[in-house]
Each structure stands twice: as C-alpha cells, then as structure tokens.
C-alpha cells in the first residue's frame, strides 16, 4: 500500500477556504537552497501555517499545510542564514536535520556563489555543535571528473574536508556526476570550456575503494545517492537522504511520528503503538523520485530555478 499525504482545509491570507496537502515530512528543498536564500520566507510561511507552490507549466497554485508536519529535512550548501531561526521549529515541536553539501570545487568555480570552503567547514562545525552531529549529514555531491580533476585529486579534496569534519558528522553521502544525462549541465560545462569525464564502473569502484581506506580514519557511514552500482563489499550502502530509519532513531520520543513510519498514518492516542495493525505492507518510498532513490515520502516546498548559487 503506497502511503499518500493527507488533505486538510485551510484559510488563506486573503480569507479563502482551500484544500491543502498536509505532509508529515517536508523537504526543504531538493529544488533550491531554502536555508541559504529563503530562510525568512520559510519562517514567515511556517508562522502562517501554509505555503503556496505554483505549477511551472500552467502556474496553477497548490497549497501545503504545516498542520501535521513533524520533520523538516533541509538541503543546503550554506545553512548559516537559517541557524538563528531553528528555535522557532523547536518551539513548534517540529524536528529537523540537514543534508549539508560541502564540496571543494573552488578552483573550478563550479559553485560560484557559495562561501569559501573554510567558512563552510566552520559553519558545518558550528551547526553540528548546536544541534548534534547525527543531524548534520555531509554530502560531497556530485563528484565531478574533468581533464584536470581526476580520481586522485577528488580523493585529495574529499580527504581534506573529511579530516576537518571528523567528529562533527556520522555520515558521508556522495554521487557520481552523470553529466551526459543532464543536457543543461553538459551545455554549461561545454560553454565554460570544461572538459568533463563521465564515470564508468571501473572509475566508480576505484574511487570507492580509496574512500573506504580513507574512512578507516573517520569511521563514518558511507552511502551513495541514487546510484545503481553495488558497493556493499566496501561497506558503502545505498542511501535514503530523507531517511525513515534515521528519523526513527533520532526522534524516537515522538509517538505520532513513529506511528506514521510504522503504520503509514498518525494517531492521537496516548499509547505508542495502538492495537491497530496495518492491513497490508505499507510503502513509504517516495514515488516521485528517481529509480534508485531510497527516500521516504515527503513534500518538497522549493521552486525550481530560484537557487542563487548559480552552480554550473
């Protein structure tokens, strides 16, 4: 049984009654960097109780209510602007954790509008100390090979960052750039005269084997994001970035949340696990993601083409 988001009625700012999706888990956001550029917007909409999304093709509005939200997963390359507002989520008993992408492509200027790498490393450490290392997941994503940046150079850069993040996170997630399947990215790199090299099974395994050795020092969980290649022999798993098992582990005292992740629905009962049992095996996998994505169902509240990092 595929779990679906609940629907509720809300009153909009202009007094209209409309139907809204009321997700348990919010993704903020795969589509844009809300913490870096839209923290105030996010908090203002949280205070209002809902946000509006517009269909990019016909501009038709749809509404997302925060009435039942228990967890927000933030995706970002710079969470610093959001940090002062985290107390507002805590005051509303809304849990959260971060997918923090911390790459090192400064020389190549692939991410032209992000802070310098040392500043990002310090922000990572500060956030980890504030909310706990289990809630800040390090992403080196994607791994990009070029004529000048081969496997050894990528490993050197990952090692440099990893050595500084030791003790400040529990997990490293990475993916291999599949540039030829993303025409816009390929066109951008060609325009910049960047000679990129797509990964193959041999180069992916070469990188993963060396990363396995580096990780003997860090002792992190290693995982790939939406990759088909099997690297389990190197103790590298397929990731769930919006991770139901992680949510259960770190927010174990939220009975409604645990009930949703077990039965596919929330409960207002006082007992942790009421007598009802699922009639069928529930499917919490997000049906709107790629084939090899293991994410738990969520609702993304970002808008495409609004990210100001201007990544190539």
What are these regions (language model features)?
Residues 202-294:
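A C-terminal junction/extension of Radical SAM enzymes
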Residues 33, 79-80, 103-105, 143-145, ...:
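Short, solvent-exposed loop/turn segments at secondary-structure junctions
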Residues 106-114, 142-152, 190-199:
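Surface-exposed cleft-lining segments at the edges of enzyme active sites
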Residues 291-312:
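Local cysteine-cluster metal-coordination motifs and their immediate loop/turn environment
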